[in-house]
Structures are given as C-alpha cells and as structure tokens.
Amino acid sequence: MSCLHVSSRSLPLDSLPRRGVGIISRPRPTLARIVTTPTWVPVLVATFLIIASLLLAFAVTDVGRQAFVDQWERSRLAFGQSLDDTEYARMEARSASLAPLYALGSALVTVLIPFIVAGTVRLALRPTEGATPSFGQVLAVLSHANVVLALRQVVATPVAFVRESLSSATTVVQLVPSLDETSPLARFFGGVDLFVVWWIVVAALGLSILYRRPARQLVASMTLAYLV
C-alpha cells in the first residue's frame, strides 16, 4: 500500500506531549510532521485516559452522580418517556454504580470516533494525483485531533461541577445567555459544541495535507455533516 510522503523538516518526531501542544498551538505544521511517521496508538490511549479519568472523577462525587441522573431523566423525557417519583428514586439509588460505567462508556466513544471518521473519509474522498494516503496516516491525523476533545473535557469537568449539570458546558449557546432556552435558535446553538468544531478544523487541516485538497472545503463539508 502506497503512502503519501510530505516534505517537512528532517527532524525526529516530537514527543507525545510536544505533539499535543503542537496540535493546539500550531496544528498544520505539527500534522505535516505527524503524517510522515504516522502513529496513533499512544495519542489515542493518552487522550482516552485523560477523558476517562476526568469523567470518572466527576462521576464518583455526589454532584456528579446527581448530574448523571438528571441527564438520564432529560434523555428519557426527550424520547417521550415519562418518569415518576419511584423510577427517579430507583435511578438515584443505582447512580453510584451506573454513573462510572456511563462515564467510561462516554470516554470509549471518543476512541471510536477516529476509526469511524477514518473509514468514512476513505470512502468519501478519492485520492488525487500524487496523493495516496494510507489508512494509518488518516487515522493518525484523526487520533491526534482527539487532543482537542481531551482539552474539552479538562474545561468541561470543572464547569459541570460548578453548574451541577452535564448539559451544554462547551456549546455555542453559552456565548449567548440572553437567548430564550425554548427558542429554536437556542436549541440549535445548544447542539453545536465549540470543541467539536475545533476538532473538525484540526482534522480537516490534516486531511488537506494528505489529500491535497483545500482545508476550507473540507472544514465546510465536515461541519455540515456534523450539524446535520
């Protein structure tokens, strides 16, 4: 299987912490170096551990357990399922064991995202002349983009603890608190996570290097897919 060779400085690949900082501060040159020696396991494990440890630390507190119960209640109501006092009390009683499992499951989802998106990208984007990236290169780009999701959890966890809620900690709606919560615009902004958009931008920058396509075009396409 042929791989794309990207011209960059002939320096050894930076350490994992330096790559993480580079993804945040200088994503394009960092990704240009990453795709020359694509690795994805270390960064995927590291970001998973960060996200999982923060979610679990929150889930074992009284505030965290109650926040998870409230989240479950909102999810059931969103699907039109009523919840009486007995069922709510049962959820509270089981929260000590279920909240950590829910937190761990949420962290595992972030591990699956790069694989799912990588598979989709391989199907949707045809290699251009002179650009035939391998699956490993695509996966390396998307896995390093998960640094943004780890940073998201670093920000969201203390906010969730203060607000005693898991909802809308890093969404656009937080920037416009004057909006009526029941308005269509508020509901739309409540579903747009700033860090997910950042993740898309970082991923698109890396994919633009691999597939030699305009980054803006990829950002627009991926953002549209996210919003839809």
Can you name each region flagged by the protein language model?
Residues 1-11:
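Short, intrinsically disordered terminal tails adjacent to the first/last structured region
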Residues 9-25, 94, 132:
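Short, membrane-interfacial amphipathic segments enriched in basic
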Residues 13, 102-109, 185-190:
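Short alpha-helical transmembrane interface motifs in multi-pass membrane proteins
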Residues 13-21, 80-88, 165-168:
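Charged, low-complexity, helix/coiled-coil-prone segments
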Residues 17-20, 43-44, 104-107, 111, ...:
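Alpha-helical transmembrane segments
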Residues 25, 29-151:
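Selected alpha-helical membrane-embedding segments in polytopic membrane proteins
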Residues 136-228:
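Hydrophobic alpha-helical transmembrane segments and adjacent short intramembrane/lumenal linkers
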